[in-house]
UniProtKB/Swiss-Prot annotation:
PANTHER family: PHOSPHOLIPASE A2, PHOSPHOLIPASE A2 FAMILY MEMBER. It is an enzyme of class 3 (hydrolase). Belongs to the phospholipase A2 family. This is Phospholipase A2 A2-hormotoxin-Apt1a. Its cofactor is Ca(2+). It comes from Adamsia palliata (Cloak anemone). Residues 1-19 form the signal peptide. One of its GO terms (biological process) is arachidonate secretion.
Length: 156
């Protein structure tokens, strides 16, 4: 399963990089619509509401991107920390809301910065959506500091 997660993450990064390189839109979904994969929805929300390329957050500080350790370096990094902890809370424990890999492929509905509570959205989808929306709102409140991009994780 870990290999699947790395492969999917690499594929997502490659797709986003190619879309940015060719100045194509990252709008994988329409507002209020549904994307092919949950990770695309998170990327869409980041782009739409922060104006930044989602890849800007990849490797930012100690917690953004794959894995995470140490103390977050600033507000944006704290957003990533809380996003990771949010996913942990819905995928771990005696009765998890979602399977371990669901946050990377489970679809959800949203409108603006609100998750849909309609019958088409599962309990897991709503939980993932809530984690993603909270992270995007956090990104919007915090200053993105370029010096923490591609941060050396070994000093975390």
């Amino acid at each position: 399963m870990q290999l699947y997660t790395y492969f999917f993450t690499f594929s997502l990064v490659l797709i986003l990089a190619l879309a940015d390189q060719e100045n194509k839109s990252l709008d994988f979904t329409q507002e209020g619509g549904i994307a092919k994969r949950g990770a695309f929805q998170f990327s869409y929300l980041i782009k739409k509401y922060t104006g930044r390329n989602p890849l800007d957050y990849w490797g930012y500080g100690c917690w953004c991107g794959l894995g995470g350790k140490g103390t977050p370096v600033d507000g944006v990094d704290w957003c990533c920390y809380h996003h990771d902890m949010c996913f942990n809370s819905i995928t771990q424990g005696p009765r998890p809301t979602c399977s371990k890999n669901a946050p990377y492929h489970k679809n959800y509905y949203f409108s603006g910065l609100k998750c849909s509570t309609g019958w088409l959205t599962s309990k897991c989808g709503r939980a993932i959506c809530a984690c993603d929306i909270a992270a995007v709102k956090c990104f919007m409140r915090n200053h993105f500091n370029n010096k923490y991009q591609n941060y050396k994780k070994n000093i975390c």
